[in-house]
C-alpha cells in the first residue's frame, strides 16, 4: 500500500515476492522471498528459494564420529547441552530418539517454499543465496554461495564466504573467504581468514582463523 517505484531499479522478480516499506532493491535477481522493512539489497546475482526447505534445521552433523554415528541435528536454538545428549548419551537410546524426533518435527514445522529476509538487513555484492532464511539487522557483503541455512539476528557474512547446510546464531561473524558445510555457529562466534569447517558445532564466543 505504500510501495514506491523508486524502491526498485534493474530488478528481476520471480515467484512469490513481498517487499516491506522503505526497502530498496537494485541490480538483483530474486525468487520466492519475503523481504521485510528497511532492507537494502544491491548487486545480488541470484537470491532464490527453489524448493521447500527447512533452512538448515534438521541437518545431521557427524561432529563426533566421521563415519556417521553419534549424529547431532541442527536447529535454530541448539545448545551444547542438547548436542551432548544427542551424541554422548547413546546408553539412553529412547531419550536420544525423542530429542531427534522433536528437532525433526520442528524443522518440518519451519519448512517453507518461501524464504525470508528480516527487517533492517543489508545484502550487497553477492553471488548465490539459495534457500537461506535471513533474520533482522544482518549484513551480507560479497558472499560467494550460501545454501540451505539460517543467518541469525545481527550477524555478518563477508567476502567470498561459502556456507552450505548451516545455522548462524545471533551476532555471529563469518568472513574472509571462510567455508562452512554442515555447521552450527554459536552466538558472537567469529570465523575468519579462510577458515574451513565441515561437520562442526561451534558454540558461543568461539574465535577461529587460518585453519580447518
Where are these regions (language model features)?
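Domain-scale signature associated with acetyltransferase and cell-envelope carbohydrate enzymes
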Residues: 1-212
Amino acid at each position: 500500500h505504500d510501495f514506491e517505484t523508486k524502491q526498485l531499479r534493474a530488478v528481476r522478480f520471480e515467484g512469490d515476492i513481498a517487499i516491506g516499506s522503505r526497502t530498496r532493491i537494485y541490480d538483483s535477481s530474486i525468487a520466492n522471498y519475503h523481504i521485510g522493512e528497511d532492507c537494502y539489497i544491491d548487486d545480488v546475482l541470484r537470491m532464490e528459494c527453489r524448493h521447500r526447505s527447512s533452512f538448515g534445521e534438521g541437518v545431521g552433523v557427524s561432529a563426533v564420529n566421521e563415519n556417521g554415528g553419534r549424529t547431532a541435528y541442527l536447529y535454530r536454538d541448539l545448545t551444547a547441552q542438547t548436542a551432548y545428549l544427542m551424541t554422548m548419551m547413546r546408553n539412553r537410546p529412547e531419550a536420544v530418539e525423542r530429542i531427534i524426533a522433536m528437532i525433526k518435527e520442528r524443522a518440518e514445522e519451519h519448512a517453507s517454499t518461501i524464504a525470508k529476509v528480516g527487517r533492517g538487513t543489508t545484502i550487497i555484492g553477492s553471488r548465490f543465496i539459495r534457500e537461506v532464511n535471513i533474520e533482522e539487522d544482518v549484513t551480507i557483503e560479497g558472499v560467494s554461495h550460501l545454501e540451505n541455512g539460517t543467518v541469525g539476528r545481527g550477524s555478518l557474512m563477508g567476502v567470498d564466504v561459502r556456507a552450505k547446510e548451516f545455522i548462524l546464531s545471533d551476532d555471529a561473524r563469518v568472513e574472509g573467504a571462510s567455508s562452512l558445510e554442515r555447521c552450527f555457529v554459536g552466538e558472537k562466534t567469529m570465523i575468519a581468514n579462510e577458515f574451513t569447517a565441515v561437520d562442526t558445532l561451534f558454540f558461543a564466543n568461539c574465535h577461529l582463523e587460518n585453519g580447518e
